[in-house]
Amino acid sequence: MQKRQNLPIMCGTLVAINVIVYLICTFTGDLLYNIGELDAVAVLRYGEYGRIISSIFLHAGIEHLFNNMVILFFLGAMIEKVTGHIQFLILYLLSGIGANICSLFYKVIAMENVASVGASGAIFGLDGVLLAWILLDRRSMPDVTPKRVILMIALSLYNGFTTQNVDNAAHVGGLLTGFLLGALFCMIRKQKRNREV
C-alpha cells in the first residue's frame, strides 16, 4: 500500500489528460481553444470563468506540450510523494487558478487581450511549493538544496522573459500562489508533528 502511495499516479493522470486534450485539439481544430483558452473579455465581461481552469489543459503546440509535461512529471512526482495524490492535485489546480487570475489582472492593467493557454502557470506553482518547503521546512524535501531550486526558478523566469509569446504574469502568479500554498502546507505539517509529540 505504501509503495502504491509513493507512485506519482496523479502526475501521470494529469500528463495523460493533457496529452489526450491535445490530441483532441489536433482533430477538432480551434473548437476547444475557442471555448477554453484564457481570454480576458470572455472571462471578465461574459462570465466564462471555467476558462480559468480549462486553459491549464490546453497547449499551443507539441513543443509547448512536451516541455510542460516533462517538467510536470518529474517535478510533480517529487511533490506528490510528500503530499499524496489528492493534496497534490489541489496544490496543482489552485496554483493554476492563481496563475490565471494574475494573468487576467495583468491583461486588464496592460490593456491587452491576448488569449493564453498552458500548464506552465500551475507548474511554476509547484516550483513555489518546493521553494516554500526548502525555506520553511527542510524535512519535507531534505535531499533538495535551496540553491538548486532558486537557480531552477531563476532560469525558468529568465527564459520566459526573454522569449516572445509567453504569459509571464501567469508564471509569476503561479510561483507566488504556489509559495503561499507551500507555506500553508508547512504550517499544517508542523502542527501535526507538534500534536504527535
Question: Where are the model-predicted features located?
Answer:
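A detector for small-residue-rich transmembrane helices and their helix-helix packing motifs
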Residues: M1-V197
